[in-house]
């Protein structure tokens, strides 16, 4: 007896006759409703930038978290469901600390990304005794930035458990126009400051609200300073530099 489309929708571990997992596809679509996040890799660093949607004038901007530290040399930007992201990030933090404790070295960026994607597949109904983290796919995508022995690296992970390495990448609601601008403006010899300006320029173009230092946030990963989320003063300076380029 054949299953209907709605039954394939409900079965998170069941492929349709066309070879599709609808719940995973829906999770990917949910990310397209999320706030825009952008990552740019330079020769010496990786810069992340995110849109912070303030749904009320009474909301404190510091409470809207879209950038997270995983380890001293790794951080990420998220788009999608923040609650899902916290589960993934907590898992990644434990994995990186276990690796550091066991091997007395920082975990590689790709290994960290792999552990995140392994977790992304642990949804639905498992076998007896098999732990499942979620009853559905995670509704969040990550831009994972870090520096290891291979230099600066930028990865994108999605709910399907797929990940790819990028030189520049945008996710979220403004990802399509942002990607077009990144393709046009990105070059491999960019400095860190140029990457900051490019990210803010692209965010300014795709955001519905006027960009200022309160509704965007930047972070960077460098060999000297590790992962660092910009404070209010640094954000104001970065936005001012981008504004000067426009003028």
Swiss-Prot record:
Modified residues (Phosphothreonine): 55
InterPro entries xrefs: Ntn_hydrolases_N, Proteasome_alpha, Proteasome_alpha-type, Proteasome_alpha_type_5, Proteasome_asu_N, Proteasome_sua/b
One Gene Ontology term, aspect cellular component: proteasome core complex, alpha-subunit complex
GO biological process: proteasome-mediated ubiquitin-dependent protein catabolic process
Top-level division of the source organism's lineage: Eukaryota
Keywords, alphabetical: Cytoplasm, Nucleus, Phosphoprotein, Proteasome
Subcellular location per the Swiss-Prot or TrEMBL entry: Cytoplasm; Nucleus
Signal peptide: none
Keyword field contains Phosphoprotein: yes
Function: The proteasome is a multicatalytic proteinase complex which is characterized by its ability to cleave peptides with Arg, Phe, Tyr, Leu, and Glu adjacent to the leaving group at neutral or slightly basic pH. The proteasome has an ATP-dependent proteolytic activity.
Quaternary structure annotation from Swiss-Prot or TrEMBL: The 26S proteasome consists of a 20S proteasome core and two 19S regulatory subunits. The 20S proteasome core is composed of 28 subunits that are arranged in four stacked rings, resulting in a barrel-shaped structure. The two end rings are each formed by seven alpha subunits, and the two central rings are each formed by seven beta subunits. The catalytic chamber with the active sites is on the inside of the barrel.
Family: Belongs to the peptidase T1A family.
Protein name: Probable proteasome subunit alpha type-5
Designated gene of the protein: pup2
């Amino acid at each position: 007896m054949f299953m209907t489309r709605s039954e394939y929708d409900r079965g998170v571990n069941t492929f349709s006759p066309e070879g599709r997992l609808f719940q995973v596809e829906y999770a990917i679509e949910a990310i397209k409703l999320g706030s825009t996040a952008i990552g740019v890799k330079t020769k010496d660093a990786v810069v992340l930038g995110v849109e912070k949607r303030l749904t009320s004038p009474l909301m404190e901007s510091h409470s809207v978290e879209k950038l997270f530290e995983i380890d001293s040399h790794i951080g990420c930007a998220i788009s999608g469901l923040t609650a899902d992201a916290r589960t993934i990030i907590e898992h990644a933090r434990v994995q990186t600390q276990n690796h550091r404790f066991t091997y007395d070295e920082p975990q590689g960026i790709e290994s960290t990304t792999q552990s995140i994607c392994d977790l992304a597949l642990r949804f639905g109904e498992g076998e007896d005794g098999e732990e499942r983290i979620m009853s559905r796919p995670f509704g969040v995508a990550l831009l994972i930035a870090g520096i290891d022995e291979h230099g600066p690296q930028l990865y994108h992970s999605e709910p399907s458990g797929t990940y790819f390495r990028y030189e520049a990448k945008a996710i979220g609601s403004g990802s399509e126009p942002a990607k077009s601008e990144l393709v046009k403006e990105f070059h491999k010899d960019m400095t860190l400051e140029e990457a900051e300006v490019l990210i803010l320029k692209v965010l300014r173009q795709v955001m519905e609200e006027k960009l200022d230092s309160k509704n965007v946030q930047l972070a960077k990963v460098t060999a000297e300073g590790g992962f660092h989320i910009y404070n209010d003063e640094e954000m104001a300076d970065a936005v001012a530099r981008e504004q000067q380029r426009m003028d």
